[in-house]
Amino acid sequence: MSELIKLDAATLADKISSKEVSSAEVTQAFLDQIAATDGDYHAFLHVGAEQALAAAQTVDRAVAAGEHLPSPLAGVPLALKDVFTTTDMPTTCGSKVLEGWTSPYDATVTAKLRSAGIPILGKTNMDEFAMGSSTENSAYGPTRNPWDTERVPGGSGGGSAAALAAFQAPLAIGTDTGGSIRQPAALTATVGVKPTYGTVSRYGLVACASSLDQGGPCARTVLDTALLHQVIAGHDPLDSTSVEAPVPDVVAAARTGAGGDLTGVRIGVVKQLRSGEGYQAGVLASFNAAVDQLTALGAEVTEVDCPHFDYSLPAYYLILPSEVSSNLAKFDGMRYGLRAGDDGTHSAEEVMALTRAAGFGPEVKRRIMIGAYALSAGYYDAYYNQAQKVRTLIARDLDAAYQKVDVLVSPATPTTAFRLGEKVDDPLSMYLFDLCTLPLNLAGHCGMSVPSGLSADDNLPVGLQIMAPALADDRLYRVGAAYEAARGPLPTAL
């Protein structure tokens, strides 16, 4: 294993810009690690070695010529979740229905990464169309957690998190619909951030649930995550839900936080997310120790009541399937991707039905059916409409909380990583794993998972979730970096 792959992204960027090492050398080191280890983890669906090295060489030429580099992360390679379109690699979303499909255009996030001089190593594995909490729903096989290959890395973005934990990439991009960045980060001892909804473009992000989906940065340190956040955030006229607002200076916040002083910062512990049935003792012990550490850094910690959080799970699992049933209607075999039964003996309607039956996995079909039912004429008011009202109440709970505190904290997940296959046949148990993360998606607010150590129960990673109001993403980074610095180095998976 090359020593280069153990370095954080900020250090690699400094070494590249100072000519101590070339971007091509760094990129090749990570490609070698992928080749050597991905048979064990299956973090990647596609590896773009040729394209990544070409991008790295472009940065190296700029460094050699003394040119201004396009971003602070120029030359540092990255793993991209396979839900963002790319013109030079397939985009499958972990689904058979898009097997082999290559987009004619880049997602805005992809384009920003290219413009920043960041080589894209490849596309990472995920639950099909981002529906799942374990990356077991991928049509191309599950991703395994580098901490224990008999356990899941979380989902839906388990591939990106596993790639970071296995030193296959120093940076990654994920998406977060109900916790799909934060939850895998917690299970792999990496850092993941769900930015404020609308602050990272969704153009070219294949939609799961349009009012919930949000792309975001992942890395092994808070500062690296902030540097990547700054690259991908910003208004995009191609995205109708994009927010026209300045991007908070998350990098400055991370650097300030690393000083370790949280004097005057008001932190609320969410009453509904700190205990209860289903919480693992080791997770709660790690969380309580993290809260004590935040207090020791000077923060004012109080308990905050968010009563409607108790209804977030049923509301989420009505709203999300409803949007899924609409968004996935376009995958019908008529335009692109898989086409089944096209032998001249079936009508167009039959081809559509056969294509969807063959192309979608069980979880996707389940959510389409739930969504179609919730949106049907007789049940729209009873289910979907009621869920949207609960969503408003959850947002009001958070707004009220932020009148009293600057950030909220909770465990990122109720337990550590569960075993492969443990929850596959129990959808409700799988859905409950999102309990801590999904309220923020319903409200459109921002959140971070930062490693808080290993559980005493099983020696597996635990994540501390930090939450902040919309457009206050910088608060996450200040508190997260302060906690990270005080916590000190952690063991790694490898």
UniProtKB/Swiss-Prot annotation:
Heterotrimer of A, B and C subunits. The active site is at 81 (charge relay system), 156 (charge relay system), 180 (acyl-ester intermediate). It comes from Mycolicibacterium gilvum (strain PYR-GCK). PANTHER family: GLUTAMYL-TRNA(GLN) AMIDOTRANSFERASE SUBUNIT A, TRANSAMIDASE. This is Glutamyl-tRNA(Gln) amidotransferase subunit A. Belongs to the amidase family. GatA subfamily. GO terms for biological process: translation. Coiled coil: none annotated. It catalyses: L-glutamyl-tRNA(Gln) + L-glutamine + ATP + H2O = L-glutaminyl-tRNA(Gln) + L-glutamate + ADP + phosphate + H(+). Keywords: ATP-binding, Ligase, Nucleotide-binding, Protein biosynthesis. Pfam families: Amidase. GO terms for molecular function: ATP binding; glutaminyl-tRNA synthase (glutamine-hydrolyzing) activity. One of its GO terms (cellular component) is glutamyl-tRNA(Gln) amidotransferase complex. Its EC number is 6.3.5.7. Allows the formation of correctly charged Gln-tRNA(Gln) through the transamidation of misacylated Glu-tRNA(Gln) in organisms which lack glutaminyl-tRNA synthetase. The reaction takes place in the presence of glutamine and ATP through an activated gamma-phospho-Glu-tRNA(Gln). HAMAP family: GatA. It comes from the Bacteria.
